[in-house]
Amino acid sequence: MYTLRDKVSDALDRGILIPKVLGSILSRPITFSGRDIFSRFSRSRRLVKEFVDTLRTSTEALASFGNYSIFDDENLGPDSVIYSFGVGTNVSFDEELVTHYGCRVHLFDPTPVSVVYMEQHPLTGVNFRFEPVGVADREGEMTFYLRFAGGSYTLFKPKWRTIDTFQARCLTLDQIMSSSGHSNIDLLKMDIEGAALPVMWDMKRKGIRPQQIVVELEVPAV
């Protein structure tokens, strides 16, 4: 089996990996699934995914909700401000937050399939407040791309052929907060297909500091 040790050695030989990231990951094997074979994963993306799996995570007060984990903060409750960017057709995370904390969740996703899904969801208008807008580091009408390899729409134009596009309005996080009447965020979740880092840099520049951030970091334009 071609292990991660082999991959890291190859990367070092070609000068594309910093030695300090080694440590305990060297003996971890890489296993492949059918999804790996038929999807266009880059070499760097697989290395990042395998490395992240080795990171130590504090499990104290860590609670799983749907596909994500958060710190089970006693301050979270019915009055908490919770933003969830990137809905798709799965709101199990948001549903469990509502059940556990009795809170309202503000959900955002401009993709057509998500708009239809949320219009039909029983919690929309009750504990869910849904807006069909995207979040970005600038305001404007933007193009979303669907990769040939499948997955979700992304703001980043893929290197490979796309099979669909659509235009949607995007706002910055501070604009969304202002229009919603919020000055702070207790929990921010972003699963926005490679666009999270620019948003987080914009947050840093503007001094937006949520109490908790749950973010999925993808390699864009793959």
For the regions a protein language model found, what residue spans apply to each?
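Phosphate/nucleotide-binding beta-alpha loop and adjacent structural elements of enzyme active sites
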Residues: 1-222
